[in-house]
Amino acid sequence: MTTDIFFNPIWDVRLTDTSLRDGSHHKRHQFTKDEVQAIVAALDAAGVPVIEVTHGDGLGGSSFNYGFSKTPEQELIKLAAETAKDAKIAFLMLPGVGTKEDIKEAQNNGGSICRIATHCTEADVSIQHFGLARELGLETVGFLMMSHTIPPEKLAQQARIMADAGCQCVYVVDSAGALVLEGVRDRVAALVAELGDDAQVGFHGHENLGLGVANSVEAVRAGAKQIDGSCRRFGAGAGNAPVEALIGVFDKIGVKTGIDFFDIADAAEEVVAPAMPAECLLDRNALIMGYSGVYSSFLKHAIRQSERYGVPAHQLLHRAGQRKLIGGQEDQLIDIALEIKREQESGAAAAR
């Protein structure tokens, strides 16, 4: 079944708000129905064209390893689809976490854009999932996570695998917030050159080095047609590029999105912020993640193990970066915490 990309001719870029998916990491997956309904209504009214709703780790992510959802994600997807008047509802899935049945259920509940994420060197595991999504008539988006870890030409080869499998837009995903300006530009440009008219290119940034907005501008100038952000930076780590700031900057440089700056600023301040457990901070932990290249969703896991074992969270995160851990390896933070704990005890014993 052929599905066109949802893209208004008046837009230069299509923006996806990920507050209700990436923000789930920051909220420890505790969204209520009232919060989701209010946020979707506000974003929709501001003109946000795509709103992503899922557990932070995608369909099926509610688990002991990733954290349990307060409200089943499928119920939230259905509520979001019923609430939105114009916006399309997207959902994320990671092969090996979500299943084909999860995709079908999400579509039945009103989701129309399937975003499939893999580690940036493992695009081949998404082939069957893209095939199924296209057969179902879903629009498809591919996420190449931790894109900072391989060079542009290698990333472009992985993007080609996704596009050939049926992906309609492949994202450079800066999961760690580790890319700096030229790194984004070069990767996006490489994907644009490789994919041509076969698929669009997108960019998903994090604020761990404070560059979410600047990197998104670089991506657009390099040819990206889809950009992610979250109101109030509501996302993992220091959060995503704030949508309200993105729109302000895009307006200033003449990039059309169809989103009203004042309405989205109101939505961020009056609707999204009250649903956040705290602001997403650019603090030492977040900076260490960006500097060391650590997957942003590790933050809450590291804080939990820090409190459990009495070791500094920033040291946990730095060593996770040294070991080049990727999404799905959060449990290894326990091993690192025990390692640091042993070192502390050995040092204390030697000092006696």
From Swiss-Prot:
Residues noted as binding substrate in the record, renumbered to the chain: 21-22, 175, 204, 295
Pyruvate carboxyltransferase domain residues: 13-265
Catalysed reactions, as listed in the record: (S)-4-hydroxy-2-oxopentanoate = acetaldehyde + pyruvate
GO MF annotations, alphabetized: 2-isopropylmalate synthase activity; 4-hydroxy-2-oxovalerate aldolase activity; manganese ion binding
Catalytic activity, EC: 4.1.3.39
InterPro entries with a match to the protein in the record: 2-IPM_HCS-like, 4OH_2_O-val_aldolase, Aldolase_TIM, DmpG_comm, DRE_TIM_HOA, PYR_CT
Keyword Manganese set for record: yes
A Gene Ontology BP annotation from the UniProt entry: catabolic process
Active site annotation, chain numbering: 25
Assigned protein family: Belongs to the 4-hydroxy-2-oxovalerate aldolase family.
Record-given protein name: 4-hydroxy-2-oxovalerate aldolase
Native source organism of the sequence: Mycolicibacterium paratuberculosis (strain ATCC BAA-968 / K-10) (Mycobacterium paratuberculosis)
